[in-house]
């Protein structure tokens, strides 16, 4: 469920919307996070403020704040106007706080759910994005940012080791700092019968100081959709790898919604590398309802033991998994509702439901 309202003050526009999707699922997966006794800790929602002409020269200001039951994210972005043939500059400041379930979560109920491992991450980043002018099919973004990462326990205190005494940071101190140069390229090809999307991200840690993290990481997502009469067949392949210095929180998490359904978040595994494949067949039943059948599979490519502290092995994660299922999607003028039923390789069944955002700030 959700609500949205727009307020106009001159050229400024404020959008307020509430979204229950992620938070209802999270309440079934995570243990109680800190400040549970505070009534405000149960407040969930999003606040978005946009100004299209901040200083009278078409400068754009974007401020968003998202709060869930267990996580929060604050983003401030300022975009300067440029000619169409030049890259658009955006200055971004972001702070997020969330439980680290994907890496340090503990699988329960035959890996169908993940419980809290008592580790949370506070991330602060400051940087600049350069959005290159898009060609007919290609677009790209280059960014450079400073990141400061602090592991916290459920009481909000800084920690440098997990409950088993293994380091949570690469430096061994209560925090990690790094400067990251990132290049993202996107390719899109569409026609009346099919589409193909490809996204490639490459990140490089720059050694500004001797104790800062040096690494190279890449991720890719390729998806292909084909119309088969009234039905749509969608296939998706994603993966990545990281070399160089590494903290456990930088590992690739496998399992959960958007990865391998039928498993809890990160319950399949976490490694230096990963590969996930998804296939889905959807068929409209009427104008507002469609049925869907899907199959997901993923693997850490036997790289779980290469993550510092080997959290996947200590938590008994299998390293590979497959999930099958079906579901319904309901479309209306108020948004989309979806219900998915999945079964994993351990014959454990899971039910996923969601109410995606009714209003977006983008």
Segments and roles (model prediction):
Residues 44, 179-327:
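Extended beta-strand-rich architecture
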Residues 123-130, 206-207, 324-333:
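A short, hydrophobic secondary-structure junction motif
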Residues 135, 287-289, 333-335:
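Short glycine/proline-enriched coil/turn segments at helix->beta-strand junctions
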Residues 291-294, 329, 336-342:
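Conserved active-site loop/cleft motifs that coordinate metal ions or position small ligands
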